[in-house]
Design a protein with these regions (language model features):
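Short amphipathic alpha-helix that is part of the acyltransferase structural core
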Residues: 1-47, 51-58, 62-65
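Acyl-donor binding region in acyl/amide transferases
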Residues: 63-155
Length: 155
């Protein structure tokens, strides 16, 4: 199904390519998963010319609104940060997470398709606020100075 395909892509990107360390169950299933997946919506970019459904999913985002967060027991971001001020906002919330794109598809076109899908979702669900976690590749602060500076000043 679509969630399995999304989890398979996430596994390939996060664990095979970026060398994150999976749990034993994740490694055995070759899937990146958690308890939030079944409650959330999953946005997929599919290249129909690729053979096999799992291989055809080349981009993904996980999306969660208040309704899905209630089913999941909260927002994923709340497991990492205090987001009480965000949750207190009036209007519909959208948490974006677990985004990744297959290596050969990291182009402006693939990201444009993902953001077009997110925009449609935002309008469809009347989203007022968007938030989420993001990972930066690496541990050297000198190499990450530019994105960290941007987040410090504008995040």
């Amino acid at each position: 199904n679509e969630i399995d395909a999304s989890q398979a892509l996430r596994y390939r990107v996060f664990y095979d390519e970026m060398n994150a360390i999976p749990s034993r169950e994740m490694a055995a299933r070759r899937r990146d998963f958690d308890n939030f997946d079944s409650a959330c919506d999953h946005l997929l970019v599919i290249d129909s010319s690729r053979v096999g459904f799992y291989e055809s999913v080349v981009g993904t985002y996980r999306l969660s609104r208040r309704e899905t967060a209630i089913r999941a027991g909260g927002f994923y971001t709340a497991s990492e940060y205090d987001i009480g001020d965000i949750i207190a906002q009036k209007g519909e919330l959208l948490e974006l997470g677990r985004s990744c794109v297959a290596k050969d598809y990291r182009t402006g076109h693939t990201m444009a398709l993902l953001w077009r899908g997110i925009a449609a979702y935002v309008f469809s669900h009347e989203i007022a606020w968007i938030f989420g976690c993001a990972s930066l590749s690496g541990t050297n602060p000198d190499e990450l100075a530019l994105p960290l500076s941007y987040l410090h000043h504008f995040g």
